[in-house]
Amino acid sequence: MWGGWEGHQPELFVEQVKNWLESEAIDYVISNDLNDYANFEFLSKFNLIIQSVTMSQLTNEQEFGLLKAISGGIGIAGAHGGLADSFRNKTNYQFMIGGQWVEHPGKIKKFKVNFLEDELTEGLEDFEIETEQYYMHYDPNIEIIATTKSV
């Protein structure tokens, strides 16, 4: 699922994900219609929803369908604001994700991304990047597996 604010380049994100899925011979469907979230029968055909939607709006029906799919065992993944700043007016969505973007402290600057030891980060190496840092409100019950610090 892609859409929302163009500043996060959701179309570029979906193109990169599409290329990766094709390289792994994985079947996929691309959509930029949030009404698909209201269709539980449609969503139930998938194992994973990869989302890149920033600063958009969900109807109650769309939110209900998405949350029903996720609570039923369908996974959800995404990156950056495409997952953490998708639907500011939907607190049930934010609760399901485990957090919500709040601010970019310091704007664009150089950071080091540090991966903690975890099976999900196995094989990944720390790296430096110049970008905006995300200040998040997050559920204290989730396990943080990567952190950032100014360089």
Task: Enumerate the predicted regions with their spans.
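Short linear motifs at secondary-structure transitions and domain/linker junctions
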Residues: G4-E6, S23-D27, S52, F87-K90, ...
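Helical hinge/lid and interdomain linker segments adjacent to catalytic or ligand-binding clefts
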Residues: W5-A84
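Catalytic beta-strand/loop cores that center a nucleophilic Ser/Cys/Thr
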Residues: E22, H104-V151
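Aromatic side chains
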Residues: Y28, F46, Y93, Y134-Y135
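Short, Lys/Arg-enriched charge-dense amphipathic segments
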Residues: N32-N35, L48-N60, S86-N89, W101-G106, ...
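Short, well-ordered alpha-helix to beta-strand connector turns
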Residues: K45-N47, I97, I142
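A glycine-rich, often tryptophan-bearing local segment used as a flexible ligand/cofactor-contacting loop or short
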Residues: S56-G123
